[in-house]
Swiss-Prot record:
Residues 388-454 are annotated as: Disordered. The gene is Nemp. This is Nuclear envelope integral membrane protein. Glycans are attached at residue 38. Disruption phenotype: ~40% pupal lethality. Male and female sterility with males showing extremely small testes and females showing extremely small ovaries. Somatic and germline cells initiate differentiation but subsequent development is disrupted. Adult testes contain spermatocytes but rarely contain elongated haploid spermatids. In ovaries, most of the germline cells degenerate at the prepupal stage and the remaining germline cells do not complete oogenesis. Defects in nuclear shape due to a markedly distorted nuclear envelope which is highly convoluted with regions of blebbing and deep invaginations. Residues 388-405, 428-446 have a biased composition (Acidic residues). Interacts with OTE. It is a multi-pass membrane protein. The keyword Transcription regulation does not apply. Residues 414-424 have a biased composition (Polar residues). Contributes to nuclear envelope stiffness in germ cells. Required for male and female fertility. Belongs to the NEMP family.
């Protein structure tokens, strides 16, 4: 009798150890990123609640798109999972499930959970099998970054998308494929009699329907592999019907309808951007800046730019000699081409222009494509440049300034008198009076050339 009593006390102690109040409250493990915990199988076959908590960390901008993943590696689905902010909350959920009146059609069983990096979260696992718990940290979650970028892109492109016919048909086809199941349920509801008792049946049917939808979502990959042909036929038929309905209705033409579509798209983009990060305060701040930049009047933006440029003007860069010569050649060719195009157009009064010119034949040849300078002028220009480059060092070495000549007698840069005068200076002075008359004639020609230039 004494040994039998000890055996009963031992068995009672083992069963008492499985009560949540005795084990779950003390069996708590705090995890850090990179933690790996391997738990062995319960040899007594009892389900033991173990709670795993992530304490969270401080909010930082660098962790805007960071994600913490809780990975549960277990061989079967023979386990229960509970969530909460604290171990006490997890324990309370565990106790609530032990009640005879609890219905758990939507019990959470996921082997991969995404946790907020900035909040404390606890997960309770109740199982008799061996399993492994891993906590991973992803500093930059590319999926969340892509979700944020798509949300901002939809927000900025909502006005154009609301008027795009291709986008209208694509969205209509997608909605038709997803909503076809609801149409089937609606048609099936028409077959039931409209009585008070049937509402309870319909409510229960909707609950079972949601449960079926959840099971379909959990086993979507298996369904796509097993019933690939049926799924493809369903997508083709419902997509074609949806396209025909959208084609019959047509894209919205009313400006108010387009505005409503734009608002809906902007709301969808804002929701996508908001749920793309666990750092909600930073995301809200970014979205406020995006809204202000999107709806900010352009006139205000231009005024701010003008005031900023006036207060901090840009430093102008001077052209180099090579850039100046290149720009001169390009602009001269462009101006000559525009002039030739104008004189050949009906807008130009050719006879009136030719009546004012001293050399109409040269003007006519220029209009027909001839160059604007002849060979002699080009040679004079090249010779003048060479002489000016040779004379520059000599002028710098001479300290005494040259005697000033009268302004009305200064030779033109490309004039023929300049070269004749230079040739005469190199020859000995003649004693006859005929040279004086030639000099006066050259001066008269020079004055005539100046008047023509002016």
């Amino acid at each position: 009798m004494h040994s039998a009593g000890l055996l009963m006390l031992t068995v009672a102690g083992y069963f008492t150890s499985g009560i949540p109040g005795n084990t779950a409250s003390s069996d708590v493990a705090y995890l850090t990123p990179g933690t790996y915990i391997n738990l062995s199988e319960n040899i007594l076959g009892l389900q033991t609640l173990r709670t795993f908590c992530y304490p969270g960390k401080r909010l930082t901008v660098s962790s805007l798109f960071e994600t913490v993943e809780f990975v549960l590696a277990i061989g079967s689905d023979d386990y229960s999972q509970y969530g909460g902010k604290t171990p006490e909350e997890v324990l309370q959920h565990y106790k609530d499930k032990q009640s005879l009146f609890s219905i758990t059609l939507f019990a959470q069983k996921r082997q991969l959970l995404q946790l907020s990096p900035f909040e404390q979260q606890c997960i309770g696992i109740s199982s008799r099998q061996a399993y492994t718990v891993i906590l991973n940290s992803i500093p930059l979650d590319l999926w969340r970054l892509a979700q944020f970028a798509v949300g901002i892109l939809i927000l900025f492109s909502a006005r154009r998308l609301a008027k795009n016919s291709v986008f209208y048909y694509l969205v209509g086809i997608v909605i038709g494929i997803c909503a076809s199941l609801l149409v089937v349920i609606y048609l099936a509801a028409k077959l039931f009699p409209r009585r008070t008792m049937m509402y309870g049946v319909l409510i229960g049917g909707w609950t079972i329907g949601f449960y079926v939808i959840k099971q379909l979502a959990d086993n979507l990959r298996l369904i796509l592999i097993t019933y690939r042909d049926h799924v493809l036929g369903y997508l083709v038929i419902t997509g074609l019907i949806s396209f025909l309905i959208c084609y019959r209705i047509g894209p919205p033409k009313n400006p108010r309808s387009q505005t409503i579509v734009m608002w809906v798209l902007q709301a969808i983009g804002a929701v996508m951007a908001y749920f793309s990060s666990w750092h909600t305060s930073a995301v809200i701040f970014i979205m406020v800046l995006v809204f202000v930049a999107h709806y900010f009047p352009i006139s205000w933006t231009n005024q701010i730019k003008f005031m900023y440029r006036r207060r901090f003007p840009l430093k102008r860069r001077m052209l180099t000699q090579e850039e100046y010569e290149q720009q001169t050649a390009v602009e001269t060719s462009k101006s000559l081409a525009d002039l030739r195009k104008y004189v050949n157009s009906p807008e130009c009064k050719q006879w009136a222009v030719m009546g004012k010119l001293r050399d109409p034949l040269r003007f006519a040849s220029f209009a027909n494509g001839a160059p604007h300078l002849d060979d002699e002028e080009i040679e004079d220009h090249s010779r003048t440049i060479e002489e000016s480059m040779d004379a520059a060092p000599e002028e710098e070495s001479v300290e005494e300034p040259e005697e000033d000549k009268p302004a009305e007698l200064l030779p033109l840069p490309n004039s023929q008198f300049r070269y004749q005068q230079a040739a005469r200076n190199s020859e000995p002075e003649p004693e006859s009076e005929s040279d004086d008359s030639e000099e006066e004639e050259f001066f008269e020609q020079e004055v005539d050339l100046r008047q023509v230039v002016q």
